[in-house]
Amino acid sequence: MPMLPTLLYVDHWSTLISTNMPRPNSHFTVTRDFDATPIASPAMSQDVWDGMEPTGSEPSSHLAEVLNQMHGARSLLDVSDLEMEVLSHARRETTAQLIVQRDDGDHFVFVGHRVQWNDARGPFKGGIRFHPAETLDMTRALAALMMLKTAVLDLPLGGGKGGVQCDPATLSRPERERLSRSYIRAMHPVLGPELDIPAPDMNTNAEVMGWMVDEFESIRGRHAPGTITGKPPVLGGSRGRPEATALGGLSVLHRVADHMGKPLAGNSLVIHGYGNVGSHAHQLATDITGARVTGVCDSRSGLFNPEGLPYEEVSAWKQRHGSFVGCPAGSAVSPEELLVQPASALLLASMEGMIDGHNADDIQAEMVVELANQPTSQEGGQRLLDRGILVIPDILGNAGGVTVSYFEQVQNASWQRWSRTQVVEQLQQEMASATDAVVDMAHRHDTDLRTAAIALAMERIVEAQRSRGWSSRSSM
């Protein structure tokens, strides 16, 4: 096992910095809590410090949208300024410089983050993303969304997120493994089953989680499978985890349609994005909702057929050819064209910002389901609402993944293995309960589902904060 860097702790819960000079597979780590001021190490380059933003700085786009939505939902609640302040800032942020050896003996330098937003209801929980455009602002925004997501589902968890700015498509499998292990070596002091539990996210998967849990257990010298979820089943991963986000989102869609008195059976769905979530949504859509899938796309190509796209034919073509180009199951459309095709529901399973102020007026779907994080901008979402298009927000629509991750934690803690049937039944029950609670909140306050979901989450988090004495108010 590679030698770990010597860590210098400066003030309890404030700053953690590495005192070693850089070398292959080592790192610099800076951990900051609340508004603690970082103390620069002489070995730390100024570029690293220049790239760090204080938590209290003016938020940029992604985080600003989340905070604006939270402040909008506050009007439905009795929340003090202090309580809102706690909700609006990260509890802890860790930024690390990761130095990873290339296959040719040279070295990459990456920057990784772990943002731990709020743990009033339980340990921090959130995925790890590998992406070229990953930023600290994006990681913060997604950590705040995870705080809301776990609370909407009433899970005993908080919210966090991690990310590394890299292009995994340019890395070999051994290089991705070394990067994954380096990230855990940098972050392990702030991770653990009772502290912060990562999971897969964009461009990370069960294989990556397997490397990460192995590295964590090697450092700690004991088995700790509950440290990371989304692992391979042989390492304690839960059955049903790969399809959990899609299954959860379809269950929510089906429940909302029933609440509206508009069953989906026989109607049409368009799925924008065909990664893990989108492909599983295509596979499961008819069984869960009774609807037919009429459109699919990846980042470069798409298909549309108003009569329906058979999953087996389309997925097999995609797997063989890497895109939908030339697939005879439907007419070729671009990803942009697919967004504006008519459908009973449009499932957004690709990236952030797919619907914004420029294209929201062209959307023809009756409902939009956010299976990705922040796929609808604040302006785009408002225009959809103004046009009477119902939006199922990401903190409800894609919460199936974290729910089954929680099931995985429960199984790991008790050394049990649930059947897939048990996982699916429990997931559908949890998603139905959360959907009913959000719809009830929306009806009681005459508001949209996003505002209702955020308000419900904030209400539950603030109750936990008050019970902990984190405000001048008390729940007693």
Predicted segments, located by residue:
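Glycine-rich, N-terminal phosphate-binding loop and its surrounding beta-alpha-beta segment
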Residues: 96-168
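Glycine/serine-rich phosphate-binding loop and adjoining beta1-alpha1 elements at the start
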Residues: 131, 150-265
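Short, Gly/Pro- and small/polar-rich lid/capping loops
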Residues: 56-97
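Adenosine-phosphate binding glycine-rich loop
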Residues: 59-60, 256-257, 362, 366-476
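Rossmann-like adenosine-cofactor binding region
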Residues: 301-391
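Glycine-rich phosphate/diphosphate-binding loop of Rossmann-like nucleotide-binding domains
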Residues: 240-243, 247-340
